[in-house]
UniProtKB/Swiss-Prot annotation:
Keywords: Carbohydrate metabolism, Hydrolase, Magnesium, Metal-binding. Specifically catalyzes the dephosphorylation of 2-phosphoglycolate. Is involved in the dissimilation of the intracellular 2-phosphoglycolate formed during the DNA repair of 3'-phosphoglycolate ends, a major class of DNA lesions induced by oxidative stress. NCBIfam families: HAD-SF-IA-v1, HAD-SF-IA-v3, PGP_bact, PRK13222.1-2. SUPFAM superfamilies: HAD-like. Belongs to the HAD-like hydrolase superfamily. CbbY/CbbZ/Gph/YieH family. This is Phosphoglycolate phosphatase. Mg(2+) binds at D12, D14, D177.
Length: 226
């Protein structure tokens, strides 16, 4: 099936539609300061994004993408609580939509595509970000990293989306910047689009085998044009 023949577009959020790294970095560093821990530059934190808030904080406390197995559980829990409070206050300070996203989503909706979001970000943050960046009311379904017991790369969020939207895998495509998006799609037998401009831990997303791969959102829009 050609990409433009798909009916449902399942979008990741961070690194796909929104460059949220600046605000995530701000919240992470505010958290680390509160805990009297060393802070990090935005580029470093950028590579820790994509597996949900808990993993992001574990990486920050470890000072590495590889989580310290000796991390104190109580410290991690406290740090996560502090981080979520800070992030709530800075969701859209520096976060921006990637080029062509707002106009592109409007055109896709007008063309008859059904749009949904499947992100590993806590669900409580999704709607405020969409509203703050002017792309609310475009999506039929919003699934966060804590909506279900499992998050990407587990296929459960994608299966849940199909059930809620009353569609089958062949009608859908998962669009994201991370290996988690591609692996989740494969596990759910859904085709996927890899976007190279996002937060894939410095890895080439092509190595995970998406059916399509684009360097810009506009290239995606061109391929979806009916």
């Amino acid at each position: 099936m050609k990409l433009q023949e798909k009916e449902v577009l399942l979008f990741d959020l961070d690194g796909t539609l929104v460059d949220s790294a600046p605000d995530l970095a701000l919240a992470v560093n505010r958290t680390l300061k509160d805990l009297n821990k060393a802070t990090f530059d935005q580029d470093t934190i950028h590579h820790w994004v994509g597996n949900g808030a808990k993993v992001l904080i574990e990486r920050a406390l470890s000072g590495s993408a590889i989580i310290d197995k000796e991390l104190d559980e109580t410290l991690t829990k406290d740090a996560l609580t502090i981080f979520l409070a800070h992030y709530q206050q800075c969701l859209c300070i520096e976060s921006v939509l990637y080029d062509d996203v707002q106009e592109g989503l409007l055109s896709l909706k007008a063309a008859g595509f059904r749009l949904a979001i499947i992100t590993n970000k806590p669900a409580i943050f999704i709607q405020p970000i969409l509203t703050g960046l002017g792309i609310d009311n475009l999506f039929e379904l919003l699934i966060g990293g804590d909506t279900l017991a499992d998050k990407k790369p587990h296929p459960a969020p994608l299966h849940y989306a199909m059930k809620q939207l009353n569609v089958v895998a062949e009608q859908c495509v998962m669009i994201g910047d991370s290996k988690n998006d591609i692996l989740a799609a494969k596990a759910a037998n859904i085709d996927s689009v890899g976007l190279t401009y996002g937060y894939n831990y410095g890895e080439d997303i092509n190595q995970y085998g998406p059916q399509w791969c684009f360097d810009t959102f506009n290239e995606l829009l061109i391929s979806l044009k009916r």
